[in-house]
């Protein structure tokens, strides 16, 4: 081996080169110098096809001479850069080392991070978030929707603020009948409503097939109200009698399937109470409320009232009628009528309940009806028999209105 003097350039013969560990530290014999050079280009996995190794007369680069000239015979430029990375950039110190430095695998590309300009991130930033909770009261057939607050809403007015309110819509269903809304809060992008809206007449079947659409809108006195964002919750995600809390990013407006909406549209529902009173010797029929009634007027509402008949009615004296509730599709009546009749005769009777829309100067419009009695089926039959079997006990049930009543005169 030729020793280097001060100021002279080190020279190593090829024989010595093939028998020396070029890494700093004690000189150790090795099998072949190529063990310390990557056999694949930077960035490719080890299974990639190896590049052609450098010719045996290519001079090796020691850590002390990483900045020295490279041999023109070494055509694998990428391999040389990898060597610089492995032996130079990783800082091999000139001190003694217990052994040869291991070959570091090529750095893995960083994992994809969420795109700050992506759809979800953009909606959360531009449209805002909404906090609310839902509770299905199975015993009372009610869905309670508590709208808590919103944060970071999109500015809609010239002053950089908005006048937000929240609108609820049960899908599928008649538009006006299934919509509820909160109060409007003025000049804020972070409104706090803490308001509970309730849908009545919700059945287990509704919880399986319906979806709650929650929209945040900006109220405008001089123009149409503007849409800010929405979210949708399939009701089948809720457990009966358990409150579920949500904090959701608002999304852009989604289309409503009008065909499906129309095919599943109902005439409405009615909550009826039945009780046979031993004291009054009669049947007490309570008209509690209606929900999701069909709109019969041009303004998208109805002016509903309810009529009841106990048939057969030879003397035609069994007709009772509630008061008219103006401009509503979810009227609350809380009226009760008494039919004097022996308990044993009820098995031969049929209770007919019909809902009407009151119109001034023309015929009233039939909205829907329901018949309870021995010839009824399903829940209507069960409700009637439960009343007969449980004297002096008030039994309330929701019933779906139909647009046809067998044997009924559908005119008022």
From Swiss-Prot:
Residues 49-73 have a biased composition (Low complexity). Keywords: Calcium, Calcium/phospholipid-binding, Cell membrane, Cytoplasm, Membrane, Metal-binding, Phosphoprotein, Repeat. Residues 38-123 are annotated as: Disordered. Its cofactor is Ca(2+). Ca(2+) 1 binds at residues 157, 163, 218, 220. Changing residue 158 to A: Loss of calcium-dependent binding to liposomes and altered fusion-promoting activity. Calcium sensor which positively regulates SNARE-dependent fusion of vesicles with membranes. Binds phospholipids in a calcium-dependent manner and may act at the priming stage of fusion by modifying membrane curvature to stimulate fusion. Involved in calcium-triggered exocytosis in chromaffin cells and calcium-dependent spontaneous release of neurotransmitter in absence of action potentials in neuronal cells. Involved both in glucose-stimulated insulin secretion in pancreatic cells and insulin-dependent GLUT4 transport to the plasma membrane in adipocytes. This is Double C2-like domain-containing protein beta. It comes from Rattus norvegicus (Rat).
